[in-house]
């Protein structure tokens, strides 16, 4: 197998820092009180969930987390976030469709990383 594209190599503190910021953004988005969540057209919520977990998957892989453990962590995090939203005083509701959007985003991110890994750098 060819070496991965140079842009996809783990970049130590930089990649871990970007992952940490992405996790912090996800915490802010997923656990903001309902009163702080802006209204949006139908479907935007699912797109936000998908893109958020896509970003978590990509930054997690860039930080060197292997695909299978990362996938399991993201599926669990997605489920936990929906349970917390459902049972907490955040004035939010848990949703299976949000969880599915999260899982789809994580899956797309992992697939995109895998595809990019297999590309050869331009010469």
Ranges and model annotations:
Residues 1-99, 103, 107-123:
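Bulky hydrophobic segments
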């Amino acid at each position: 197998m060819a070496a991965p594209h140079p842009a996809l190599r783990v970049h130590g503190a930089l990649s871990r820092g970007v992952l940490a910021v992405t996790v912090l953004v996800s915490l802010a988005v997923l656990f903001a009180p309902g009163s702080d969540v802006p209204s949006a057209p139908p479907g935007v919520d699912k797109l936000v969930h998908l893109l958020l977990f896509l970003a978590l998957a990509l930054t997690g892989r860039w930080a060197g987390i292997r695909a299978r453990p990362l996938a399991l962590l993201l599926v669990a995090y997605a489920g936990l976030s929906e349970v917390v939203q459902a049972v907490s005083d955040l004035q939010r509701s848990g949703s299976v469709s949000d969880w599915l959007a999260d899982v789809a985003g994580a899956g797309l991110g992992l697939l995109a990383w895998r595809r990019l890994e297999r590309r050869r750098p331009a010469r």
